[in-house]
Design a protein with these regions (language model features):
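Short, surface-exposed "cap/lid" segments of acyl-processing enzymes
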Residues: 31-36, 41-92
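Gly/Ala-rich beta-loop-alpha elbow adjacent to hydrolase catalytic centers
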Residues: 137-146
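The feature captures the conserved acid-bearing segment of alpha/beta-hydrolase catalytic domains
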Residues: 166, 171-231
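Alpha/beta-hydrolase active-site loop
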Residues: 103-129
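Conserved hydrolase catalytic core segment
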Residues: 148-159
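Bacterial signal peptide processing site
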Residues: 15-17
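Post-His helix in hydrolase/transferase enzymes
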Residues: 232-243
Length: 243
């Protein structure tokens, strides 16, 4: 029987979501942060597909930083929880879904891609993979974080990188939207050269598909007609779920 996850009962104002019984909640403690994850691991020989969440509820509708970055959108969780592959993990970003004394507003604003954040994600991914091959699927800011993990850890056995509505360079992204720079964050020097696929909607107002077109090879890009930042991907799930 399916169970209703109420975001660990720690949060308010967020959407609940039905989590399949095949997924188990695990809190991963790294040297810097605690990370929430939901894991389905059923085949020791298959790659582990790790979905990395976006920046979440970092700013309110007035543009001010929030006190809790846990995502209100269930977009990525829904995709992860319906992935039919045997080994699937949804990995939240630091400070999402958990109470962690280490967290500060900087961790989901100017420092959302800091070295401490990257190190924490790397430790969590290494812990989850347990020497399995890895497919990283990053959504929005999670795309850049996953790219940074790949860039800084060439020995990590990542066989494929998939991004959904992904920020691929935060300097160019903030410039494109005329936003303040993320002064406490690390940026990608160049995109990884591993097998990759980038999906983005042509109606996405958070990340411009035109910017993505400038950054990735056309053969690795799918621009989805009428898709927004968190809607319109249903007909392309098979591309995401490919091994």
């Amino acid at each position: 029987m399916k169970k209703i996850l109420l975001l660990l009962l720690l949060l308010s104002g967020c959407h609940s979501i039905v989590v399949p019984d095949s997924f188990t909640y695990k809190e991963i403690k790294t040297n810097t942060y605690k990370l929430a994850s939901w894991q389905k691991i059923t085949d020791k020989k298959s790659p582990v597909r790790i979905y990395i969440e976006g920046d979440g509820y970092a700013f309110n509708h007035l543009g001010y930083p929030t006190t809790n970055p846990t995502p209100h959108s269930t977009f990525l969780r829904e995709i992860a929880f319906t992935d039919p592959n045997p080994n699937v993990v949804y990995l939240a970003r630091p400070c999402q879904f958990v109470k962690d004394e280490r967290c500060s507003v900087k961790d989901w604003t100017t420092g959302r891609f800091s070295q401490d954040i990257i190190n924490s994600a790397t430790q969590a991914i290494t812990n989850i993979s347990n020497k399995h091959h890895i497919i990283l699927i990053g959504y929005s800011g999670g795309a850049l974080l996953s790219g940074l993990v790949i860039e800084q850890n060439p020995k990590l056995p990542v066989k494929k990188w998939i991004t959904l509505a992904g920020v691929l360079n935060h300097t160019k992204w903030t410039d494109d939207l005329n936003l303040p720079p993320l002064k406490d964050s690390v940026d990608l020097k160049k995109l990884p050269t591993i097998s990759q696929l980038h999906l983005i909607g042509d109606k996405d107002k958070t990340v411009s598909y035109k910017l993505t077109e400038k950054l990735v090879d056309n053969k690795n890009l799918i621009v989805i007609p009428k898709a927004t930042h968190d809607k319109g991907y249903t007909n392309y799930l098979s591309k995401i779920y490919e091994k």
